[in-house]
Amino acid sequence: YFRYYDVRQASGITTAGQFIIRFIEDKMNEYLNKVLQTQGQKDYIVASDTDSIYVCLDKLVEKTCKGKTNEQITDFIGRVCDSRLEPYIEKCFAELADYSNAFKNAMVMKREVIANKGIWVAKKRYMLNVIDEEGIRLSEPKLKLMGIEAVKSSTPQVCRGKIKDAIKIIMSKKESDLHDFVAEFKKEFKELPPEAIAFPRSCNNLRKYRDNANIFIKGTPIHVKGALIYNHQVKEFGLQNKFPYIQEGDKIKFIKLVEANPFKFDVISYITSLPTEFKLKQYVDYETQFEKTFLDPMRFILQAIGWEHEPKASLEAFFG
């Protein structure tokens, strides 16, 4: 309980934040269209968030930085932000404070990063190839990832690293280089133990989905289904003293199985390692795991830029 709790206050804060960021977005677009003489034809704001705007300065670079090195272009953009954009934003905030009858302006926006490439997959899902961070020039570009599977704990660790490597290739190399990388990783992936490629999850609602006759009920989440199958098989094999049952709230891993396996189920979960007594290693569905853990997350990115993860045969190539 909080003395000053009031939904109206929360709503007012949220609405004010949305209004402020949209106000700055409109003002920045207006300013850049005027300076670059695009007469309101271009939207220079790629995206905005609660307290951030992402500004595309490609037209400015094209007009003023022909023949310049990447280092010189970055220096130029930094100077533009410091001497033009930030003072303009400060002026706009003062105007907004006056408009809203604020006691004084308390809003400030500073440049965070300069990136030479960026890809937006969806709202709040993007990646930036950062070359300058808060005025500090980076010796090597640094990936800033938001909402991408490479930073999600639900993705296997090995795939998180490889997704980051693939994004680096997308940011700096050619599509054919990505094809080679994916093909090589697929070979490596099929040699990895099941524990390395399984999905990590937290297991909840075991009692809700358990069925004494059929192990699990229809509609059971796949990782819970795998956990119930695991507990059933531990009991069937008499392994209770060697392997603990999966309990409510346990951190587990689950992995897909090919259909032709002794358990007749398409998934199995476990706590730390797959019991050798189950003799399921040869039935691990590496193809599906590769699709779900690596290719599916990559497809969102590749669709946004029109790339493929492997070479596509064309009619021209077929007929030589």
Segments (PLM) and residue ranges:
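DNA-dependent DNA polymerase catalytic subunits
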Residues: 6, 14-48, 57-320
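Active-site cores of enzymes that catalyze phosphoryl transfer or operate on phosphate-rich substrates
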Residues: 1-3
